[in-house]
């Protein structure tokens, strides 16, 4: 993270997301500020609040994608939730504190995977020795026999590494995994049922081992996982996970506009103002109890987003507005943006479809005028019907390539080594009537 300046972060986001420079700069600064905070003396570090962000923009313009790419870039615990899934404390449904509990689970998995990767070579060596022990009889004690046994072991080790023994069956002792007790959790009670499951599993599981007959390939995988788990210090892992969540955690709250109170209608709404009020202490800073320990939310970065079609940011309660100090407006996408989305990002949509059809032996070539026409059709349909942003490109491309994809195997034989060329005329042929007919495009595109 130390080497990632705001310019580097924006540059990396540009590889995957077209436009929306203001939003990219805002999240890049928020991420860099977290690193800067960690360099401060401890007394001042505690006073620096995270730069929470409110993203405002229509659907399909890149709000969620920016947050998703940012999390990968930061290599930090990240969770995306929808505000509409939560209810006020005391009502049936999930309460907002479950966001932090879920974030802790993400952090535990992230750090455990890293730790297992770190001790991978040790686990590989231990698994290899156990497989060889199962393949060969116990070593003899006299010197001449011991040398012979060692030579045989090295021969088998070479065969094992080269995969020659993968399909051979052996008897191995592995930890038994007794069938767990599944408890259907009512909304909001996931934490309690998780604790009950842990309690029952500990009561019924004394780490018993059993012998299984497995192929070497499967046995190696099981034993490697078992050996890797032995090298992981679970207590230390919990401490590191709590620290990672408290100082590096990112929570992305989507559909925040759906819990904004519209107009001056009377009465309380369980899934609106109550959820906003419950979010306040979480965003401002509170302590949440999880099964791994107490987690402080003071320095978790919160990014909220919403389209705000039927409501405005000012419809959020004032206290919540104050806790999302940085506001970024994302602009609607133009036909030129659509054209860039189809070609510029790494693993763009057109590259994905080409790669998928290449697996059938069909070489697809999409011309520039074809891409221009696809972008125009997608933009026109958005203008005439519901504007769903760049997601419309998925629908248009899927419809355009439907027949080609269905007949890909026969087309591959027909075209041999020649590419199948798609141009603007092909777009008009496949989509022209649908795009021009508003009623049809409303239901099909």
Curated annotation (Swiss-Prot):
GO BP annotations listed: protein unfolding; proteolysis involved in protein catabolic process
Any one Gene Ontology cellular component term annotated for this protein: HslUV protease complex
Any GO molecular function: proteasome-activating activity
Ligand binding (ATP): 18, 60-65, 254, 319, 391
Protein's cellular compartments: Cytoplasm
InterPro entries: AAA+_ATPase (IPR003593), ATP-dep_Clp_protease_ClpX (IPR050052), ATPase_AAA_core (IPR003959), Clp_ATPase_C (IPR019489), HslU (IPR004491), P-loop_NTPase (IPR027417)
Domain of life: Bacteria
Key words of the record: ATP-binding, Chaperone, Cytoplasm, Nucleotide-binding, Stress response
Subunit structure: A double ring-shaped homohexamer of HslV is capped on each side by a ring-shaped HslU homohexamer. The assembly of the HslU/HslV complex is dependent on binding of ATP.
Reported function: ATPase subunit of a proteasome-like degradation complex; this subunit has chaperone activity. The binding of ATP and its subsequent hydrolysis by HslU are essential for unfolding of protein substrates subsequently hydrolyzed by HslV. HslU recognizes the N-terminal part of its protein substrates and unfolds these before they are guided to HslV for hydrolysis.
Entry similarity comment: Belongs to the ClpX chaperone family. HslU subfamily.
HAMAP family membership: HslU (MF_00249)
Protein name as it appears in the record: ATP-dependent protease ATPase subunit HslU
UniProt organism field: Alcanivorax borkumensis (strain ATCC 700651 / DSM 11573 / NCIMB 13689 / SK2)
């Amino acid at each position: 993270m130390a080497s990632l300046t705001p310019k580097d972060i924006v540059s990396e986001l540009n590889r995957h997301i077209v436009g929306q420079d203001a939003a990219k700069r805002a999240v890049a600064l928020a991420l860099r500020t977290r690193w800067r905070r960690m360099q401060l003396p401890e007394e001042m570090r505690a006073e620096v609040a995270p730069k929470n962000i409110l993203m405002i923009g229509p659907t399909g313009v890149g709000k969620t994608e920016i947050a998703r790419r940012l999390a990968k870039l930061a290599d930090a615990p990240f969770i995306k939730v929808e505000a509409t899934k939560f209810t006020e404390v005391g009502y049936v449904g999930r309460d907002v504190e479950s966001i932090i509990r879920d974030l802790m689970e993400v952090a535990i998995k992230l750090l455990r995977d890293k730790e297992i990767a770190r001790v991978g070579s040790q686990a590989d060596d231990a698994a290899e020795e156990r497989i060889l022990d199962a393949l060969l009889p116990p070593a003899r004690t006299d010197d001449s026999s011991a040398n012979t046994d060692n030579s045989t072991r090295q021969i088998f080790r070479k065969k094992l590494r080269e995969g020659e023994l993968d399909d051979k069956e052996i008897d191995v002792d592995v930890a038994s995994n007794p069938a767990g007790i599944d408890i259907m959790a009512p909304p909001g009670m996931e934490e309690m049922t998780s604790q009950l499951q842990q309690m029952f599993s500990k009561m019924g599981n004394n780490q018993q081992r059993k012998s299984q007959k497995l192929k070497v390939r499967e046995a190696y995988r099981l034993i490697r996982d078992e050996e890797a788990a032995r090298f992981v210090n679970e207590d230390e892992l919990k401490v590191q996970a709590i620290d990672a969540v408290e100082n590096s955690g990112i929570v992305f709250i989507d559909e925040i506009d759906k819990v904004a109170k519209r107009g001056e209608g009377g009465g309380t709404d369980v899934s609106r103002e109550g959820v906003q009020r419950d979010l306040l202490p979480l965003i401002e800073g509170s302590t949440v109890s999880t099964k791994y320990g107490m987690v402080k939310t003071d320095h978790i970065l919160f990014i909220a987003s919403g389209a705000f079609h039927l409501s405005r940011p000012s419809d959020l309660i004032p206290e919540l507005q104050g806790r999302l100090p940085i506001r970024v407006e994302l602009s609607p996408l133009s036909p030129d943006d659509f054209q860039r989305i189809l070609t510029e990002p790494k693993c763009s949509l057109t590259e994905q479809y080409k790669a998928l059809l290449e697996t059938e032996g069909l070489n697809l070539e999409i011309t520039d005028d074809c891409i221009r026409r696809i972008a125009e059709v997608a933009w026109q349909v958005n203008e005439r019907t519901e504007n769903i942003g760049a997601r419309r490109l998925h629908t248009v491309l899927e419809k355009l390539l439907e027949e080609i994809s269905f007949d890909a195997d026969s087309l591959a034989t027909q075209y041999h080594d020649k590419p199948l060329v798609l141009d603007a005329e092909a777009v008009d042929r496949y989509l022209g009537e649908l795009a021009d007919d508003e009623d049809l495009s409303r239901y099909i595109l």
